[in-house]
């Protein structure tokens, strides 16, 4: 079991284990999930991606999704893994496979009422559990801003989802001289958008410093 970010970082470092011939399950529906799925596929594995909502709610850019499917990633929509099952050899406690992933327990979902963001909430379909055999699980689930930032920064305005409120053009927050951008402001998005926000903030900071006596 590995996070998508850890996996992609390992690829860059050249330390990723051999995926050749393995069955890989990716959990998530964002752009990072697509990156992880396509990367694992190119490393020689069979990749299945599980997302608990429908195609309409899937947050990844459609271009990323289309490329993943074209390359051979299999989608399992309205499917939510709830438990990872490990391998254990009762006859040999020293078996090197002990503790490795052998399968996931997955439950099928149905769409219920919309949540606060307007997306219909996924609810479990009773009695729909099934076992999916896999050799590796890549977790590519959404993240939220570190609550430590808002909890330790007095006067910093945040929205109801915990994102920092910042000026769209300058990145300046409710605290003069404090700037923010990227996922901490917008929620899950792309690296390109985060880089753009950083550039705008840098320009605003430069202008502010030039005006400082």
Regions from the PLM with identified roles:
Residues 37-83, 213:
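Rossmann-like dinucleotide-binding cores of NAD(P)H-dependent redox enzymes
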Residues 2, 74-76, 105, 179:
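General small-molecule cofactor/ligand-binding pocket signal
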Residues 29, 52-54, 183:
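Cofactor-binding loop segments of dinucleotide-utilizing enzymes, especially the Rossmann-like FAD-
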Residues 16-45:
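Rossmann-like NAD(P)H-binding beta-loop-alpha module
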Residues 2-22, 115-188:
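FAD-site-proximal beta/loop scaffold in flavoenzymes
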Residues 36, 181-212:
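A conserved FAD-binding loop/helix module that cradles the flavin
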Residues 13-15, 78-135:
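A structured beta-alpha segment of the ubiquitous adenosine-cofactor-binding alpha/beta core
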